[in-house]
Amino acid sequence: MLVHVEDGKATRVEGDPDHPVTRGFLCGKVAQYLEREYHPERLLHPMRRIGAKGEGRFEKISWDTALDTIAARLKSTAEQHGAESILPYSYGGNMGFLNGSSMDRRFFHRLGASRLDRTICATAGATALMEALGTKTGTEPEQFVDAKLILVWGANVHGTSVHLWPFIVEARRRGAKLITIDPVLTKTAALADQHLFINPGTDLALALGLMHVIIGEGLHDADYVARHTAGFDELAELVRGYPPERVSALTGIAAEDIVNLAREYATTRPAVIRANYGLQRSERGGRAMQAIACLPALTGSWKDVGGGFCLSTSGAFAVDRAALERIDLEPHPTRLVNMSLLGEALTELDIQALVVYNSNPAAVAPNANRVRQGLLREDLFTVALEQFATDTTDYADIVLPVTTFLENTDLYLAYGHYHIQMARPALEAPGECKSNVEIFRLLAARMGFDEACFRDTEDEMIRQALASGHAYLDGISLERLDQEGSVRLNVSPTGEPFQPFAQGGFQVTHRQPAHNGKRVQVGRVHRVGDGRGIAEHVADRCGGPGQRISDGLWHCRTLPVAVGVADVGRPAGLDMPEG
């Protein structure tokens, strides 16, 4: 992104026309970013709560007062309840690597605080990729133009992967066919050559059904499977139980369409699959993603330029996280708290202090009522680092104003392409805003942490991150990033097939989890007890199969009764804190 600045003020932003993936285009959110940057409600000074929790009433205080208050409270909390009673809570924020995964992690590790298991977005999918491919990487967007069949599975690329969409458009101009699989008729689905409505939560069944046809008709690449995969015989035995008729009953897709899709996918070269995170946020969603990711290994489509699979490219950014986060600073191993279970943690565990940054848990964490119940505790000391007042800051005892990405030096990784980027501040921070890095650096000094790493500058930490020794980062330095801004990782050379398994082989068979089948909750997951699919549970509660409506979602006339709404067909009230 390019920022035009006159007399110290940004006048407009635009996409970088020289970037090989974004090619000068900004999404609607970022294109309007200056409205956020200069919004009159931006937080500019540290504040202390003066009203009841949840009221959002504060008074302005100095940075010295704010930092001294926080340090004193964290020290006393650690002394009285143990440092594990202190919990950090953060996630993506403005996506800056330093401002989300460096000085903050060092601070909490040195403190001995509880660690946060950041599960809210993509844990199931990421785990699935590691089990299926051995790495969290995939076909790069530039190669989609070479595909002859593009299968978009559970993704609205037109609206949520706007920089990939032009490559798909170009591929179709060259003759590629676009097929979408989604419970919803998205804009992408409406533009596709073929759309298959699938019952929610049945993606695993469809993937196994496709494998049934591919293997049963001998359409798999036997040589590729023999040389590059493990567990084929077990997989072949497993998918025998998923003939098209059974899969059709589960998924709602006609058996004929399942057979035709399997044949077309297996025989069209190159063929590429683009999936997204929505389908892994369901019962057995991780297993569904694992199965889908195995399809290119069956057909050998990884051999082709423009073939393969992509959920995320994030695993290729092999920066030295250990050097940035410094878990070795922990005085002893500490407990891990699942961020998706924050409500339970605040109401059941001995959490006495909560430090929130790069996130708004009162609005985004599952079980919102339980989260708010915890945030209302008078004995809970809450600190929030924010750019604006949010649902979470309303409950905070201390609020600290932070910078935007236009005001930071930071390193930016990606999950949709293979270009690493560094940015310098385009603007000076307004008011008294400070970066996350600077805030935790100052807090470390207040806490008496005298390790040299707490005095590292942003440039020093970027150098540490790039010094992982991984081949993907060979030749990529701070100086080069400073000069070029964006640099492509040393993944497969341009024009050659992308190979995701250089660091590990394909694993295509199901392995029983070592943790006794305990589920990992990711995002807003509806948990059910017996492990069956969502579709079957909806059917059970309705007393029969769900009724399809035009956009491919489920409609159940009797479900309101099951969830406590007595009069079906009459308006029902939905209470929200805002009224």
Predicted segments, located by residue:
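Extended redox/cofactor-interaction regions of prokaryotic respiratory oxidoreductases
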Residues: 101-169, 174-180, 204-208, 293-395, ...
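Short beta-alpha connecting loops at secondary-structure transitions
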Residues: 190-198, 403, 418-429
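Hydrophobic, low-acid, alpha-helix-prone terminal segments
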Residues: 525-528, 532, 538, 542-553, ...
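Active-site phosphate/pyrophosphate-binding segments
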Residues: 210, 228-342, 483-485
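N-terminal leader/propeptide and maturation segments of large enzyme subunits in energy/redox metabolism
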Residues: 45, 49-60, 65, 217-255, ...
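Flexible, glycine/charged-enriched surface loops at secondary-structure junctions
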Residues: 81-85, 220-225, 272, 303-310, ...
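Short, well-ordered loop/turn and helix-capping segments at boundaries between secondary-structure elements
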Residues: 113, 212, 216, 297-304, ...
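N-terminal export/assembly segments and adjacent metallocofactor-ligating motifs
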Residues: 1-219, 241, 246, 254, ...
